[in-house]
């Protein structure tokens, strides 16, 4: 997650948007992360669940340097595999778990948009993430919170 760390160390204002359905096991990972990330002057968590299109105006009004959408993404890898990729690459190379057209969504934002994708194990109906995905999310939260807190203490 070197690329994520570089973004966290250089951006001045980042929105972390959590996408997902909390009633479909690992699909809740984006919501879990934005519910548990530490808000700072740099990191602004936004839980959008299944309706990111309803937050386009708010995100643009907040005018972040960078937008990271956190969601489960089918990379055809082992559960918990993580990749941070520009949204345009995601469209070309992976299958997204929702019906949102990411290509169309990208056109509404003025800032660079990335997807922090986490490979799910189970997106069937039910609550609670699988251990592999929760462990991955907790590791990412630790990285994000540590970098953000260190920069906030240092005054950016």
Give the location of each predicted region.
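N-terminal catalytic or cofactor-binding beta/alpha core of small enzyme domains
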Residues: 1-121, 127-156
């Amino acid at each position: 997650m070197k690329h994520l760390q570089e973004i966290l160390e250089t951006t001045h204002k980042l929105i972390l948007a959590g996408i997902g359905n909390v009633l479909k096991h690992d699909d809740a990972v984006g919501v879990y992360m934005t519910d548990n990330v530490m808000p700072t002057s740099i990191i602004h968590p936004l839980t959008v669940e299944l309706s990111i299109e309803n937050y386009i105006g708010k995100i643009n009004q907040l005018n972040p340097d960078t937008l990271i959408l956190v969601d489960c993404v089918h990379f055809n890898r082992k559960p918990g595999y993580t990749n941070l990729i520009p949204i345009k690459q995601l469209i070309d190379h992976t299958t997204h778990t929702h019906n949102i057209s990411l290509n169309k969504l990208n056109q509404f934002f003025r800032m660079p948009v990335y997807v922090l994708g986490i490979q799910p194990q189970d997106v069937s109906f039910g609550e609670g993430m699988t251990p592999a995905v929760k462990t991955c999310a907790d590791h990412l939260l630790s990285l994000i919170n540590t970098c953000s807190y260190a920069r906030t203490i240092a005054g950016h």
